[in-house]
């Protein structure tokens, strides 16, 4: 029964250190394998229009990071795949589940992307299962990520349909208001939901949403994630696609949810909002700091790579990260 499982979130958990076996944090290996490919970090900038664009996607791919291009400029996806392949880079795109997306997937047979993410808010749906099967029939070599979900049953169904990885998280993100608008979601217990889903998974799990600090990446891996999708920590950079806004002499970047009226262009079935984030330097600096912090996490775990994080003990201490405990 669900009511028998412990419920907690990132701020409620502290990982317990083990004896360090490396002489320098720089020796810790933060690389991760997804499908046939290895990447520098187990993190993915959220496939949102204010987080990633083609320029950032290209740069991430060149530097060895994983990315997922958003699906909100449908006509540009095919040229994007071609351009990435011409440079010898992986192509990783998103699709929805509308009828036109079936034709689009079929049209990719001659130049199939390495990764496709089926990206809808409630991924435990027949429409997602049908799309997984369609992609696997038309593009059998393409790695399929499906989501988003929040239960073990959903993970098993999507895996059984052919998904190569599932994305876990229903509304825990900073600009998502699903739990407020609908009463449903994993907001406030995202880490426990991740643990619950990971126990049922046979394939990689991607934790999506609720990441507020770099330490949350290590916690996600401890509780079963292979990779971690992050929105707000990747928003607000100088090169971020979000619109630049000046307020009282200060510079901000817009950051809004994929189900917001700003993304949809209409006030209908809105489950996202828009916020302004202070501009915070370059994306490369954040990626470097994330890697260094994750290397420190590995050193505290007593290992040499990400796998060591999966075996550490932990304690549940309610609201152990609270008043002002931020980077």
Curated annotation (Swiss-Prot):
Its EC number is 1.7.1.7. It comes from Streptococcus pyogenes serotype M28 (strain MGAS6180). Pfam families: IMPDH (PF00478). It catalyses: IMP + NH4(+) + NADP(+) = GMP + NADPH + 2 H(+). GO terms for cellular component: cytosol; GMP reductase complex. NADP(+) binds at residues 205-228. Disulfide bonds: none annotated. GO terms for molecular function: GMP reductase activity. Keywords: NADP, Oxidoreductase. The gene is guaC. Catalyzes the irreversible NADPH-dependent deamination of GMP to IMP. It functions in the conversion of nucleobase, nucleoside and nucleotide derivatives of G to A nucleotides, and in maintaining the intracellular balance of A and G nucleotides. It comes from the Bacteria. The keyword NADP applies. GO terms for biological process: purine nucleotide metabolic process. NCBIfam families: GMP_reduct_2, PRK05458.1. Belongs to the IMPDH/GMPR family. GuaC type 2 subfamily. It is an enzyme of class 1 (oxidoreductase). PROSITE patterns: IMP_DH_GMP_RED (PS00487). This is GMP reductase. The active site is at 176 (thioimidate intermediate).
């Amino acid at each position: 029964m669900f009511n028998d499982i412990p419920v907690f979130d990132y701020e409620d958990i502290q990982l317990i250190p083990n004896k360090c076996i490396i002489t320098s944090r720089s020796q810790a290996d933060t690389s991760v394998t997804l499908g046939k490919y290895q990447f520098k970090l187990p993190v993915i900038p959220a496939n949102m229009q204010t987080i990633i664009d083609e320029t950032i996607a290209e740069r991430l791919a060149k530097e060895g990071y994983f990315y997922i291009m958003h699906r909100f400029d449908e006509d540009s996806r095919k040229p994007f795949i071609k351009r990435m392949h011409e440079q010898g880079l992986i192509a990783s795109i998103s699709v929805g589940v509308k009828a036109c997306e079936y034709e689009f997937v079929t049209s990719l047979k001659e130049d199939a992307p390495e990764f496709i993410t089926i990206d809808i808010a409630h991924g435990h749906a027949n429409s997602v299962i049908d799309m997984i099967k369609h992609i696997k029939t038309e593009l059998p070599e393409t790695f399929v990520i499906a989501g988003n979900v929040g239960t073990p049953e959903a993970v098993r169904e999507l895996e059984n349909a052919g998904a190569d990885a599932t994305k876990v998280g229903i509304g825990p993100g900073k600009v998502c208001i699903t739990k407020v608008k609908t009463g449903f979601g994993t907001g406030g217990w995202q880490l426990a939901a991740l643990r619950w889903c990971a126990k049922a998974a046979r394939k990689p799990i991607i934790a999506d949403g609720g990441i507020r600090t770099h330490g949350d990446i290590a916690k996600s891996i401890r509780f079963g994630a292979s990779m971690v999708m992050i929105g707000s920590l990747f928003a607000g950079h100088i090169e971020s696609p979000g619109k630049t806004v000046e307020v009282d002499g200060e510079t901000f970047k817009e950051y809004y949810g994929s189900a917001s009226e700003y993304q949809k262009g209409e006030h209908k079935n809105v489950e996202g909002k828009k916020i302004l984030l202070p501009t915070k330097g370059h994306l490369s600096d954040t990626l470097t700091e994330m890697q260094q912090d994750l290397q420190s996490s590995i050193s505290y775990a007593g290992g040499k790579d990400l796998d060591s994080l999966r075996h550490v003990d932990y304690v549940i201490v309610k609201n152990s990260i609270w008043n002002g405990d931020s980077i």
